[in-house]
Amino acid sequence: MFARLPLYLRLVRMDKPIGSLLLLWPTLNALWIASDGHPTWPLLVIFTVGTVLMRSAGCAINDYADRDFDRYVKRTENRPITSGKIKAWEAVALAAALSLLAFLLILPLNTLTKELSVAALFVAGSYPFTKRFFAIPQAYLGIAFGFGIPMAFAAIQGHVPLLAWVMLLANVFWSVAYDTEYAMVDRDDDIKIGIRTSALTFGRFDVAAIMICYAATLGIYVGIGVLLGFGVLYWLGWAAAAGCAIYHYTLIRNRERMACFAAFRHNNWLGGALFVGIAAHYAAGSF
């Protein structure tokens, strides 16, 4: 069992934390806004650890679902299931165990949060299969990656206000932007194997679509900032995030594979900038 631990860690991408961070930033935004800048330490631990666990479970399910496709994609041909180092049933069992651990974490929270977690599990588990049917599965991914937002509001406020759903919508636009950059890396392979992605759906308008999605994300956060009366520290964070989006354009405009992948990874800084702006605003108001 312990000898196989490195394989399991590779399966759930513990060596690639970018995915967990892309889930974590929107969740932290929600925790700070829902609590007026004062989330409790237990909630921070529950949602942070839960985010890592569910992202890991999602990776295991994704590799299970894509096991017959990954062998034809250069970037994924050596993944543990595809290479035969881990059996398919092991990935399913690991995903189930991680999901159970994540659910156990939220047992102290209210009923609404638990109910939302069931919906979150369904969306996360079904996402990998949407690549067979949906023209833009990245939008579905945005819902999966953003479910921590309504759950955070439910845990703190006991209900899910309209603001939470607006923040989730912003996350959908952001996910379409960064995961289209990711899909541009595999475009040629995806055409061969018949996987549907936003990069293929947008075609020659892929770069324009990405920038429109960034603009929509940032535009929604302008509305949030105005609605909540955020101060200059928030807007500095917002400006840094906008600068990241502009930088991404310089990376993706020529559609070079590694540059597109670099843009995808750089979204950690965009998400982090928005969170720092939100947290700084509330912190400044505490003094």
UniProtKB/Swiss-Prot annotation:
Record-stated family: Belongs to the UbiA prenyltransferase family.
Biological process annotations from GO: ubiquinone biosynthetic process
GO CC, any one term: plasma membrane
Recorded metabolic or biological pathway in which this protein acts: Cofactor biosynthesis; ubiquinone biosynthesis
Record function comment: Catalyzes the prenylation of para-hydroxybenzoate (PHB) with an all-trans polyprenyl group. Mediates the second step in the final reaction sequence of ubiquinone-8 (UQ-8) biosynthesis, which is the condensation of the polyisoprenoid side chain with PHB, generating the first membrane-bound Q intermediate 3-octaprenyl-4-hydroxybenzoate.
Record Pfam families: UbiA
Keyword Disulfide bond belongs to the record: no
UniProt topology in membrane: Multi-pass membrane protein
Catalysed transformations (reactions): all-trans-octaprenyl diphosphate + 4-hydroxybenzoate = 4-hydroxy-3-(all-trans-octaprenyl)benzoate + diphosphate
Protein name: 4-hydroxybenzoate octaprenyltransferase
Record flagged with keyword Metal-binding: no
UniProt KW keywords: Cell inner membrane, Cell membrane, Magnesium, Membrane, Transferase, Transmembrane, Transmembrane helix, Ubiquinone biosynthesis
Molecular function per GO: 4-hydroxybenzoate polyprenyltransferase activity
InterPro entries reported in the protein's UniProt record: HB_polyprenyltransferase-like (IPR006370), Prenyltransferase (IPR039653), UbiA_prenyltransferase (IPR000537), UbiA_prenylTrfase_CS (IPR030470), UbiA_sf (IPR044878)
Regions that span the bilayer: 30-50, 89-109, 133-153, 158-178, 199-221, 267-287
Cofactor(s) the protein needs: Mg(2+)
UniProt-listed PROSITE patterns: UBIA (PS00943)
Enzyme class: transferase
EC number: 2.5.1.39
